[in-house]
Amino acid sequence: MATFQSLPGFREFYPDALARRNHIFRLWRQTAVAFGFAEYDAPVLEPLELYKTKSGDEIEAQLFSFTDKGGREVALRPEMTPTVCRMVGAKANALKRPIKWFSIAEYYRYERAQKGRERAFFQFNADLFAEPGPEAEIELIALLTQCLKAFGLTEQDFYIRLSDRNLWFFYLEALGLDEPRIRAVLSAVDKFEKVGDDAFKPYAEQFGPLDLALKQRVLEFLQIKTLASLEQTLAPLGGEKLAARLGDWRKLLDGLAAMGLSPFIEVDLGVVRGLAYYTGFVFEAFDRKGELRAIAGGGRYNDLVKKLGGPDLPAVGFAIGDVTLGLLLDARGLMPAFVQASDVYCVIGGAAERQAAFADVNALRAAGFKVDYPLKDVPFGKQFKLAADSGAKLALIYGPDELAKNVVKLRDLTTRTETDVPREQVQAMVRDFFSTD
């Protein structure tokens, strides 16, 4: 007989796993709403061209794509940013600004399944449109930090690495590189931490080996860890645009400090983000012990709305993945144990008593109580074991004697005390029991 298993990288959520997922979603949603963000959703299937031209080569290589029955080339979404930019661009004139949106959705990437990485995964995405200044980054980084602190994580558990593609462009242009070479160098910088010098091989294949002196300057820039060092290194370049950009850095770091977030922030120019559309500040969150891949990442993408046919609208966004976050919460002992427990269990004597119990079961459920009962006739002794296994705190006993007296016996399953209650008072007594529990 054939057996079927789920596909590699696609998770099945049994009730306990789904309870964990819902816990994560609930705190994400609660935090975003507290920051004034509105929730949205979008199609899971999109035109293939949306990602081929906007997300970059790495994402394109990971797409689940096919030709549908109408002859259209389509793909399961690997990310949300192009979609939300299209949505905002389509109704930009009607939307109240700044536009602060979030979503919790599933994404698909055909890559090797490994620790912290699946082929189907959920992300919390938050984006802020129509604010060109660093005030937007302050708000987004504050939201990211709180989305992780909400689970009990502290500055001892995670930190956020902050970088700037703009400053990289200023610096590399000053070293004499044109835009194609700058992008190739940034691609190498993005991978340097993982693979070392091998990160520069694609540059060499495309343009020839990078000049050793220039490469040394790149590696020195990578080592900068403070704003003061940034200013000192870039001071000889001069220019109003560079001065303004360094002013943005001061405003951003001062704003984060005023929010009390400095313990979470590290200047780290090794973060450039691989996606093609980032244009300014970029940031990633990591666990302090360095045991996991990035927990979250994002940055500014000022050109994408316009490239997708909308108005010229600046934007910043980030995403947190559920897989790595779940691993971190487990490692820190911060994922609660989820037990599905009833409030009330009905112990039923037989067919006649069952009919009487059904009215109370239905009324109590309608009143918001979690009520369970045996679906078939079972001996009383076994029913009390079922009641204990259900996690219920209260048992309602419907036996022949109780039915004859038009009462129900209430048993406190913790203290084992029992009380006879008139049928018409059952709901009120149950409510009183749980209000004083």
UniProtKB/Swiss-Prot annotation:
<dbReference type="InterPro" id="IPR004154">
    <property type="entry name" value="Anticodon-bd"/>
</dbReference>
<dbReference type="InterPro" id="IPR033656">
    <property type="entry name" value="HisRS_anticodon"/>
</dbReference>
<dbReference type="InterPro" id="IPR015807">
    <property type="entry name" value="His-tRNA-ligase"/>
</dbReference>
<dbReference type="InterPro" id="IPR041715">
    <property type="entry name" value="HisRS-like_core"/>
</dbReference>
<comment type="subunit">
    <text>Homodimer.</text>
</comment>
<comment type="similarity">
    <text>Belongs to the class-II aminoacyl-tRNA synthetase family.</text>
</comment>
<keyword id="KW-0436">Ligase</keyword>
<keyword id="KW-0547">Nucleotide-binding</keyword>
<keyword id="KW-0030">Aminoacyl-tRNA synthetase</keyword>
<keyword id="KW-0963">Cytoplasm</keyword>
<dbReference type="GO" id="GO:0005524">
    <property type="term" value="F:ATP binding"/>
</dbReference>
<dbReference type="InterPro" id="IPR036621">
    <property type="entry name" value="Anticodon-bd_dom_sf"/>
</dbReference>
<dbReference type="InterPro" id="IPR004516">
    <property type="entry name" value="HisRS/HisZ"/>
</dbReference>
<keyword id="KW-0648">Protein biosynthesis</keyword>
<dbReference type="Pfam" id="PF03129">
    <property type="entry name" value="HGTP_anticodon"/>
</dbReference>
<dbReference type="GO" id="GO:0004821">
    <property type="term" value="F:histidine-tRNA ligase activity"/>
</dbReference>
<dbReference type="GO" id="GO:0006427">
    <property type="term" value="P:histidyl-tRNA aminoacylation"/>
</dbReference>
<dbReference type="InterPro" id="IPR006195">
    <property type="entry name" value="aa-tRNA-synth_II"/>
</dbReference>
<protein>
    <recommendedName>
        <fullName>Histidine--tRNA ligase</fullName>
        <ecNumber>6.1.1.21</ecNumber>
    </recommendedName>
</protein>
<keyword id="KW-0067">ATP-binding</keyword>
<dbReference type="InterPro" id="IPR045864">
    <property type="entry name" value="aa-tRNA-synth_II/BPL/LPL"/>
</dbReference>
<dbReference type="GO" id="GO:0005737">
    <property type="term" value="C:cytoplasm"/>
</dbReference>
<dbReference type="Pfam" id="PF13393">
    <property type="entry name" value="tRNA-synt_His"/>
</dbReference>
